[in-house]
């Protein structure tokens, strides 16, 4: 949602992540970290220095590349395997990311809920609403 500016998707699904056990600090990191799609040293270093777990960092890199470049570098794919994901889990992650990318493109293109001109809710706002 963040990479595709899908305000509706963020505002609807970020609270579900919090309810599912994602910590507010982790959600904030995902919202504010620069994209690592191009594997730039600065961006990757920012991710490495974040409070996210190793698995979360690998998922962020994979998601960034899938969302913005479509093709995923072998090294980024290997990070998921290093973090212990099975082939099945990688396929499930891939289809989940692809599904959200499809939905976000429809939501933004059609301005569903007339959200394009709005800001994404802050993590603090989301937590307060729970």
Identify the meaning behind each predicted range:
Residues 1-130:
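Hydrophobic alpha-helical segments
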């Amino acid at each position: 949602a963040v990479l595709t500016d899908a305000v509706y998707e963020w505002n609807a699904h970020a609270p579900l992540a919090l309810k599912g056990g994602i910590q507010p600090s982790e959600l904030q990191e995902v919202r504010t970290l620069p994209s690592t799609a191009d594997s730039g040293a600065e961006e990757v270093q920012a991710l490495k220095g974040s409070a996210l777990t190793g698995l979360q960092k690998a998922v962020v890199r994979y998601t960034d590349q899938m969302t913005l470049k479509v093709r995923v570098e072998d090294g980024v794919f290997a990070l998921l395997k290093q973090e212990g994901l099975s082939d099945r889990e990688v396929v499930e992650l891939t289809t989940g990311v692809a599904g959200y990318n499809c939905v976000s493109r429809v939501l933004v293109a059609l301005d569903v809920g007339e959200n394009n001109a709005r800001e994404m809710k802050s993590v603090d706002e989301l937590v307060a609403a729970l």
